Amino acid sequence: MKILVFNVRITRIEIHLSVLLLFSYLFYQGWILKLHTWQIITACLILLGSVLVHELAHVAAFSQLLGIRSQVLILAVGGAAIPLEKEPTCRGWRFAMVALAGPLANLLLAVLAVIVLVASQDQVTFNLALTSCLLNVVLGVLNLIPSRPFDGGHMFAMLLEELLGHPRLADFFARTIGSLCGCLLMLASYYLRDPFMGLGALASLWANSPLSSGRS
């Protein structure tokens, strides 16, 4: 079920109802930290905007590097679905750069937030810039983890395939490293008592297991 639909140039953005689960988690964390309601709502909106920029960077990279356009972007709690007008025929470094585009966009947003942070002259601007910086750093770094379904996992798999020239061997190494990262994430979620990190760890372990579908 969609809760919001709008267009960014030729791309139709559809935000799924499940995104509210992520917002519920943020409200829970904000309640634990004793934040004001307006602070939590602001963080939710900044996060939503940052995720949209992340996914639109992928859409732009698909178009510029692979010549493939997407007219729809479906944003849900586990990430985004980007239906393409045709399947890409090339993989290798170009595909890896498409995967890198999202995290890179978040890190660039974090840099811009730092600039605003340094130049800010009032507390409201300072808080907004700080929140934006922290959220974008988390999004960028998390997605650089070399484990599918994170962008870093897709990038790592594509670069391995380009380097080794043997798709099955590259996939084996990518799954092995990805599974190890999933186990480390699971341990981190246990010690930090972070259920969302635990869900990310489970997604990582599943995406890199022999039971999941072939290469992503």
Where are the regions that the model predicts?
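Hydrophobic transmembrane alpha-helices and their immediate loop junctions
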Residues: 1-216
